[in-house]
Amino acid sequence: MSQSILYKIANPYADALLELSLLNNAMDKASSDLSMILEVISKSADLKLFLSNPLVEDNLKKNVLNQLFKDKVSDFIVKFLMVLVDRRRISMLHLIIDKYFSLVYKTESTILTEVITAIDLTEEQEIALINKIKVMTKGKNVKLITTIDQTLIGGFIVRIGSKVIDASLSGKLKQIAFYLETN
């Protein structure tokens, strides 16, 4: 299935999850629970395969999810996971949670920013970058998602929605190469 179709399927579930977290007055708790669930599932390839396998019975999936998360996350999150199993959407959990976080950030007026760097940013650099992004976007909160890509050689790339700011050394070299080729 194409990514856009998968996101269209994930949207109503993410909307419902956000509504549930707001009704339970537990958006922060739900967000931390979902982060923990994503971390557990992403660390275990076997669990990921198990949950996405259509041949595994739903009751078995529910039992495993209950054993893993029942005492660690909110009841409404566990019930939500059971609904996903019943509707055969548990394999889309990662997409649903991603979309949920996008909705949370929009609700909190948080600007989701992807930063790709050649090396780790220091805490001071992150704070300075967050402050610059706040000024640029007139946003209240900025959430940085940092990724290391050593092919950048130096500098960084910032993605805010559809905007891309390429301040990397490899980007500058590509610009110079393009300029030399066209002249």
Swiss-Prot record:
Gene Ontology annotations for the cellular component aspect, listed alphabetically: chloroplast thylakoid membrane; proton-transporting ATP synthase complex
Gene3D superfamilies, A to Z: N-terminal domain of the delta subunit of the F1F0-ATP synthase (1.10.520.20)
GO molecular function terms noted in the UniProt entry: proton-transporting ATP synthase activity, rotational mechanism
Location relative to the cell: Plastid, Chloroplast thylakoid membrane
Membrane topology listed for this record: Peripheral membrane protein
Keywords from the named record: ATP synthesis, CF(1), Chloroplast, Hydrogen ion transport, Ion transport, Membrane, Plastid, Thylakoid, Transport
InterPro entries documented for this protein: ATP_synth_OSCP/delta_N_sf, ATPase_OSCP/d_CS, ATPase_OSCP/dsu
Main localization category: plastid
Family per similarity comment: Belongs to the ATPase delta chain family.
NCBIfam families cross-referenced by the UniProt entry: ATP_synt_delta
Summary of subunit composition and partner proteins: F-type ATPases have 2 components, F(1) - the catalytic core - and F(0) - the membrane proton channel. F(1) has five subunits: alpha(3), beta(3), gamma(1), delta(1), epsilon(1). CF(0) has four main subunits: a(1), b(1), b'(1) and c(10-14). The alpha and beta chains form an alternating ring which encloses part of the gamma chain. F(1) is attached to F(0) by a central stalk formed by the gamma and epsilon chains, while a peripheral stalk is formed by the delta, b and b' chains.
Main function: F(1)F(0) ATP synthase produces ATP from ADP in the presence of a proton or sodium gradient. F-type ATPases consist of two structural domains, F(1) containing the extramembraneous catalytic core and F(0) containing the membrane proton channel, linked together by a central stalk and a peripheral stalk. During catalysis, ATP synthesis in the catalytic domain of F(1) is coupled via a rotary mechanism of the central stalk subunits to proton translocation. This protein is part of the stalk that links CF(0) to CF(1). It either transmits conformational changes from CF(0) to CF(1) or is implicated in proton conduction.
Protein name per the record: ATP synthase subunit delta, chloroplastic
UniProt source species: Antithamnion sp.
